[in-house]
């Protein structure tokens, strides 16, 4: 059973571009991928594909076909977004899967992805523009100590510790610490 990276995907583009990009994620639909369409390996959305597409289309205020908008959603990745979208799975299953770079260039979208992998305690930040240029950074999660029970837990830099609960006691007050 792999560790999971969970995070936020923000995609900017035209209606057709965003729709195509969302269609590349494995979903709860049956079938879970669109037959004949290359998809993101081990990259999941936790809902029916059309629900995400309908929500994304509601972000467009202009009726013009070439109008652009942004849409953000939650996704999960087996091991890491890097291994699912950049290097690893896509190369091993190239006839079925594609890289983030290929998808952004084909769909004409730009993307920002932030993930947190709490099992191995790292976070990722990935950007890809509509030409397929990818930038990826990763770093250790930040450690916090619960003020109530002393439990050490980790959060990503994009997560607000005031919005988190201690996995041990459920308290919501933390202090930054150096321990992991």
Q: Language-model segments: which ranges?
A:
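Short, extreme N-terminal segment that most often corresponds to the first beta-strand
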Residues: 1-33
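Short coil/turn motifs at beta-sheet boundaries
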Residues: 2-4, 66-68, 159
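Charged interaction segments
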Residues: 25-28, 34-150, 178-180
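The −1 position to Zn-ligating cysteines in a subset of zinc-ribbon hairpins
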Residues: 145, 165-168
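Short functional micro-motifs and their immediate structural scaffolds
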Residues: 154, 173-177
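Short linker/helix segments within small regulatory modules
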Residues: 155-165
């Amino acid at each position: 059973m792999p560790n999971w990276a969970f995070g936020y995907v923000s995609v900017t583009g035209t209606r057709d571009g965003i729709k195509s990009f969302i269609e590349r994620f494995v979903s709860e639909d049956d079938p879970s991928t669109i037959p004949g369409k290359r998809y993101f390996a081990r990259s999941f959305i936790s809902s029916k594909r059309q629900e995400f597409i309908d929500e994304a289309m509601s972000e467009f205020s202009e009726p013009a076909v070439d109008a652009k908008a942004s849409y953000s959603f939650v996704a999960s990745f087996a091991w890491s977004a890097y291994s699912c979208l950049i290097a690893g799975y896509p190369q091993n299953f190239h006839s079925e899967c594609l890289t983030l770079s290929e998808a952004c260039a084909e769909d004409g979208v730009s993307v920002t992805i932030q993930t947190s992998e709490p099992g191995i305690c790292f976070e990722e930040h990935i950007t890809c523009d509509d030409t397929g240029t990818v930038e990826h950074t990763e770093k250790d999660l930040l450690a916090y100590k619960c003020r109530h029970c002393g439990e050490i837990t980790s959060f990503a830099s994009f997560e607000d510790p005031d919005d988190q609960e201690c996995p041990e006691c459920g308290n919501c007050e933390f202090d930054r610490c150096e321990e992991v």
